[in-house]
């Protein structure tokens, strides 16, 4: 009986030591989140599976659990994704504000937040273009000239945005950030497609990236869609 008890205790200790713990401590000043339930979801079996939940109380929430390996997750409010976060060993600090979200405190989260901040700056410059167009026209600038100048700016910003995403994914081919950002990038498409940016990313990707469940499923669907388009 004692041997059995020792075996059970040893097995429990081994299981705990073989798994890693994650702790995500969050805060928010968004009034609409107070009292709401947030969900932590990960991609599994072609779906976003909830693995934890936490209610926002006095602007605070917390996720805590055990994981077998580092995972890319998303914080959800109902069916809407609020922000991505990496579940890795260590204490992760999440901040949700009206205009910016961040996850810091661990290496991969720091890297992800820095990337999102840089991308947000480019997105803000793109969003400013219609306002610049209105200003230039109001100042009497020829409309054709306005379209030419702002069109060039838009193309340059789109190229800068694509390069930022591609370089970040390539720099993180062998960890969860690569497939995770690829999933974020392609989730905005109406349906899976292949374009020069995706082809460049895939052409140089190692097996770890290509065999990620989401990447693998996306490429299968995209190649099928492109084949159908070629038949028309």
Where do the PLM segments sit?
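Charged, long alpha-helical assembly modules
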Residues: 170-232
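Bacterial Sec-dependent N-terminal signal peptides
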Residues: 1-28
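A short, acidic, amphipathic alpha-helical segment used as a generic capping/interface helix at domain edges
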Residues: 163-170
């Amino acid at each position: 009986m004692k041997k059995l008890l020792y075996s059970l205790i040893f097995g429990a200790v081994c299981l705990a030591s073989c798994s890693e713990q994650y702790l995500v401590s969050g805060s928010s000043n968004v009034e609409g989140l107070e009292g709401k339930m947030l969900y932590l979801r990960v991609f599994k079996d072609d779906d976003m599976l909830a693995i934890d939940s936490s209610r926002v109380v006095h602007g605070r929430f917390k996720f805590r659990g055990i994981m077998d390996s580092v995972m890319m997750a998303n914080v959800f409010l109902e069916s809407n994704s609020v922000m991505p976060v990496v579940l890795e060993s260590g204490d992760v600090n999440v901040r949700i504000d009206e205009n910016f979200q961040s996850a810091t405190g661990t290496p991969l989260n720091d890297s992800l937040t820095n990337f999102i901040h840089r991308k947000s700056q480019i997105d803000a410059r793109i969003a400013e273009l219609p306002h610049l167009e209105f200003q230039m026209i109001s100042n009497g600038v020829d409309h054709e000239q306005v379209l030419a100048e702002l069109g060039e700016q838009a193309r340059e910003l789109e190229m800068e945005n694509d390069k930022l995403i591609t370089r970040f994914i390539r720099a993180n081919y062998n960890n969860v950030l690569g497939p995770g950002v690829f999933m974020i990038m392609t989730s905005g498409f109406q349906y899976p497609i292949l374009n020069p940016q995706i082809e460049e990313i895939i052409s140089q990707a190692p097996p770890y990236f290509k065999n990620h469940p989401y990447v693998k499923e996306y490429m299968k669907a995209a190649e099928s869609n492109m084949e159908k388009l070629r038949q028309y």
